[in-house]
Regions:
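Solenoidal tandem-repeat scaffolds enriched in leucines and small polar residues
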Residues: 168-260
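Repeated scaffold domains used in trafficking and secretory/extracellular systems
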Residues: 70-75, 108-117, 146-155, 189-198, ...
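Blade-level signature of beta-propeller repeat domains, shared across WD40, Kelch, NHL, RCC1
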Residues: 364-395
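Short beta-strand elements that form the blades of beta-propeller/WD-repeat-like
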Residues: 74-86, 113-124, 130-131, 157-166, ...
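N-terminal Lys/Arg-rich, disordered targeting/topogenic segments
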Residues: 1-20
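Non-cytosolic head/periplasmic domains of membrane-anchored proteins
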Residues: 103-203, 207
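Structural motif
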Residues: 128-131, 167-173, 213-222, 260-263, ...
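A short beta-strand motif characteristic of beta-propeller blades
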Residues: 56-68, 99-105, 137-143, 180-186, ...
Length: 497
């Protein structure tokens, strides 16, 4: 007898089998995608380190503020989805929920940070110690035999160190992400004081310093690994090279004591921004490539201006200041300045959009719309919108208070006028007395108003005097003909006077 076939059951069985195969392929694709994401997101880290890094990044903390560990804070830097705090003894990293991802003793006297994406290089300027980190792990440690002048790290994992040498005046050694030497460049006539790596290719620029006719002579050279000789060079007579920034494959920015210069890959100057008669005190790179400068007037006072430059070194804004800022940062079209315990916000038209006073204000570092700041014992956050809203509310309250005081004064004056008018109908002597009272009330209002304005001006002048006294305790700026040094905590640097 023929067996009947239930085609409905056959179809269901085939559909389940097909679904099983699709789920298996989807799971396999997810694993491949996850591994690819880890490799791309964390460069040439091993898989275990990459997994730990991503896990630490997304692990939840208790939020901000967080209590900072002991030690003197030296600097604060941003990295991809993380914050780096440099103390005199330890390095710390935090994610955006306040979770501490890294806590390690660095053992350096002058720790300096160079950030590249989700990793950063820590080296002892003037010392010999070098350490590489992810957000949550120490990747490796490299020891050099000679004092380090400068260092830089690229997103592709390469890093370079400019240092002294035994048989030559200086050297620059380029390493890959595993800490193996790619190239070694020796310089017998000039010390290499600056180095910057390209993120997307095996190339770097080196700044060399020399003297000519009693003045500085800076030389900038571009190198392509593993070619021994420079592919292009340029001399800058009379200028002191302070910092190099290899933006991408075709643009190189050089900061000297006199100007900021933009070069192409052939080291041909394409743009320049001069400081004029002012002196460079501080500079800061933004995450979008813009550059902020603080320039002090040559009058001997602590007055100056903060300038924001775009990628073509065109000035977007110039903000006058009556005192040197303690900190400066750029993010999302906002210039942040910290000064005398207050955070000042400016847009790129130069208009002040907010200000916020904070007791014990220390370091500042914006990431996105959030500003991270320290207060001595805590790491805190506030958004730029919150600062602007609070500024607006204070302004509205002040205007309302002034309007109320003015209305009250007008009512008082009106009542006194009516009283004076009534008294004048009684006697001429009373009229004279009423006039005296009205004039006295008016004078009192003017006196109170002047006192209020005067107290604000006096407070501002006292703040200025305090700032001036604090600043005057530091040595005055050296002239352009004298050797200067750079103290850099990447991405923010400050010229030591």
């Amino acid at each position: 007898m023929a067996q009947l076939i239930d085609f409905q059951k056959v179809r269901r069985r085939m559909w389940r089998k097909r679904l099983h195969n699709l789920l298996f392929l989807a799971g396999f694709a997810a694993i491949v995608f996850g591994v690819s994401f880890l490799v791309y997101h964390n460069g040439n880290m091993d898989l275990r380190t990459a997994v730990n890094t991503v896990t630490a990044e997304f692990a939840s903390g208790s939020g901000y503020p967080v209590v900072l560990p002991g030690g003197r804070l030296l600097g604060m830097s941003y990295m991809d989805n993380g914050l780096i705090i440099t103390a005199d003894s330890n390095l710390y990293t935090y994610n955006n929920t306040g979770r501490r991802m890294l806590d390690v003793q660095h053992g350096m006297i002058n720790p300096t940070i160079s950030v590249a994406g989700s990793r950063f290089l820590a080296y002892d300027r003037g010392g010999t110690k070098v350490m590489l980190f992810s957000r949550s792990n120490q990747l490796r440690q490299v020891s050099t035999d000679f004092a380090i002048y400068d260092g830089d790290m690229a997103r592709n994992g390469n890093f370079a160190l400019a240092s002294r040498s035994d048989r030559h005046l200086s050297q620059v050694i380029a390493y890959n992400g595993d800490g193996n030497i790619i190239c070694r460049y020796l310089f017998s006539r000039r010390p290499a004081v600056c180095v910057s790596l390209a993120d997307s290719k095996d190339a770097m620029t080196v700044g060399l310093l020399d003297a000519q006719n009693g003045d500085f002579l800076s030389v900038i050279s571009r190198y392509q690994f593993p070619i021994e000789n420079p592919t292009a060079s340029i001399e800058l007579p009379g200028e002191l090279i302070l910092h190099l920034n290899y933006q991408d494959g075709s643009n190189i920015r050089a900061i000297t004591d006199q100007r900021v210069i933009l070069f192409n890959s052939d080291m041909k100057e394409t743009a320049s921004f001069s400081y004029g008669e002012q002196q460079l005190i501080r500079f800061q790179y933004g995450q979008d490539g813009k550059l902020a400068l603080y320039l002090r007037d040559a009058t001997g006072e602590r007055k100056g201006r903060a300038v924001v430059l775009n990628d073509h070194l065109e000035a977007l804004c110039s903000v006058p200041q009556n005192a040197d800022p303690n900190g400066m940062a750029l993010e999302n079209g906002i210039l942040y300045l910290s000064q005398s315990g207050e955070i000042l916000l400016y847009n790129f038209t130069g208009k002040q959009t907010g200000h916020y006073a904070i007791n014990g204000l220390g370091l500042i570092q914006p990431m996105g719309d959030t500003l991270y700041y320290t207060t001595g014992s805590e790491l805190c956050t506030i958004t730029s919108k919150e600062i602007m809203d609070r500024t607006s509310q204070r302004g509205s309250s002040k205007n309302a208070s002034e309007s109320s005081s003015t209305a009250s004064q007008r009512r008082g004056s009106s009542e006194e006028s009516e009283s004076a008018s009534s008294s004048s109908r009684r006697s001429s002597s009373s009229d004279a007395e009423s006039s005296k009272m009205e004039q006295s009330a008016s004078d009192r209002w003017e006196m109170v108003k002047d006192a209020l304005l005067g107290s604000e001006s006096e407070a501002a002048s006292q703040d200025g005097e305090k700032t001036e006294k604090t600043s005057s305790s530091q040595p005055e700026a050296s002239s352009a003909s004298e050797a200067s040094s750079i103290s850099e905590s990447d991405p923010e640097s400050e010229v030591k006077e």
